[in-house]
Design a protein with these regions (language model features):
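Conserved small/polar residues in nucleotide/adenosyl-binding loops
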Residues: 197-199
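Short beta-strand-to-loop junctions in surface cap/lid or active-site-entrance loops
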Residues: 191-195
């Protein structure tokens, strides 16, 4: 059961993502990171600074990035592909479906700027349909981390999980819900509060 929930402290999930990627990169030389010209916004640029030979900026070519991710995964790499959620799922749906989900390749799509809180980017960058699009794909595991602490646990967990994953994170800082690490498991939920009424 989660006991420490919704403190006043906040952290950004993108910062947690980049920190966890760097830590994972030190432990596993098969981790490769791709980005689609948004590495400063997705925070993957930090990984590229530490591991320049394992970071590839694919430019404004999101569907091509997913195709490259599929190819690298087919060669045994653990691929993290990042861009904004609107581009990761909207522009790349067919490529993800045909080249990643159906062949069950080990690609981890980490999409930032999900939902409606995208700052000055406006309505054209908002993405509400991403969970629906990714959830219906065969073999795809969909994860929406609750906070930065959980995001730091999600990265190594999905690296260990064989098969495609879609991780959805927002742009803004989020309240800290989990004070400690280690509770996250792929496919498992949490009891937030016990009640007399169970729905």
């Amino acid at each position: 059961m989660v006991s420490a929930i919704l403190t006043d402290k906040k952290r950004n999930l993108r910062d947690a993502y980049s920190s966890a990627l760097i830590e994972l990169g030190h432990k596993n030389p098969d981790v490769v990171v791709l980005d689609a010209d948004l590495a400063l916004s997705t925070k993957t640029k930090r990984f590229g600074t530490v591991f320049p030979d394992r970071f590839f900026d694919m430019g404004i070519a999101e569907a091509n990035m997913m195709g490259v991710a599929a190819g690298l995964a087919a060669c045994g790499k653990i691929v993290f592909a990042s861009t904004f959620a609107v581009f990761a799922t909207g522009r790349c749906y067919d490529t993800i479906r045909q080249s990643i989900a159906y062949p069950e390749l080990n690609v981890k799509i980490v999409a930032t700027h999900a939902g409606i809180s995208v700052g000055g980017d406006g309505a054209s960058h908002q993405m509400l349909e991403d969970i629906a699009l990714m959830r219906v794909l065969p073999n795809m595991t969909v994860i929406a981390p609750a906070d930065a602490t959980e995001m730091e646990d999600v990265v190594p967990a999905i690296a260990e999980h064989e098969g495609p994953c879609y991780v959805r994170i927002g742009r803004e800082d989020a309240p800290i819900i989990f004070e400690t690490h280690g509770a996250f498991e792929v496919g498992k939920g949490y009891v937030l509060r016990l009640s007399l009424i169970h729905i």
